[in-house]
């Protein structure tokens, strides 16, 4: 089995369905004998360019270990899910379990905003 990193851009109006989508995809992976090593919800972020006339999207990052057959099934599910605007799958050499650079930036931004709110109060 190989290690993969999947980044999903979800339609911003479907943000409430993100946990259910994650559970469905996790179920597909574990049913095929794979493992989920890391799931990060980067939240709603600004897009660099418009995708389907949208300026924002909900970002997810999933690191998994799965077979090629499971990956084909998952990518097939991404293609037929209208809520998934874009997806990118990258083969990794080893399992990634620590926080990604993007997640560290998100946490840093949240800490900075919380600190600014404390100063404002």
From Swiss-Prot:
Superkingdom, taxonomy of origin: Bacteria
Family matches, as HAMAP family: Ribosomal_bS6
Record keyword Ribosomal protein present: yes
Basic and acidic residues composition bias: residue spans: 105-115
CDD domains from the UniProt entry: bS6
Gene Ontology, cellular component aspect: cytosolic small ribosomal subunit
Keywords carried by this UniProt record: Ribonucleoprotein, Ribosomal protein, RNA-binding, rRNA-binding
Matches recorded under SUPFAM superfamilies: Ribosomal protein S6
Positions of the UniProt region annotated as Disordered: 102-121
Gene Ontology MF annotations: small ribosomal subunit rRNA binding; structural constituent of ribosome
Protein known as: Small ribosomal subunit protein bS6
Organism: Polaromonas sp. (strain JS666 / ATCC BAA-500)
Pfam families: Ribosomal_S6
Recorded family membership: Belongs to the bacterial ribosomal protein bS6 family.
GO terms classed as biological process: translation
PANTHER family xrefs: MITOCHONDRIAL 28S RIBOSOMAL PROTEIN S6 (PTHR21011), SMALL RIBOSOMAL SUBUNIT PROTEIN BS6M (PTHR21011:SF1)
UniProt xrefs under InterPro entries: Ribosomal_bS6, Ribosomal_bS6_sf, Ribosomal_S6_plastid/chlpt, Transl_elong_EF1B/ribsomal_bS6
Function, as annotated: Binds together with bS18 to 16S ribosomal RNA.
């Amino acid at each position: 089995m190989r290690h993969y990193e999947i980044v999903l851009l979800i339609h911003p109006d479907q943000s409430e369905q993100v946990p259910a989508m994650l559970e469905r995809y996790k179920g597909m992976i574990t049913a095929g004998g794979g493992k989920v090593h890391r799931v990060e919800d980067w939240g709603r972020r600004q897009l660099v360019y418009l995708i389907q006339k949208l300026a924002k999207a909900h970002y997810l990052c999933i690191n998994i270990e799965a077979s090629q057959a499971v990956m084909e099934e998952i990518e097939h599910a991404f293609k037929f899910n209208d809520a998934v605007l874009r997806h990118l799958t990258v083969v990794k050499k080893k399992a990634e379990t620590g926080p990604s650079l993007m997640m560290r930036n998100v946490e840093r931004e949240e800490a900075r905003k919380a600190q600014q709110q404390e100063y404002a109060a």
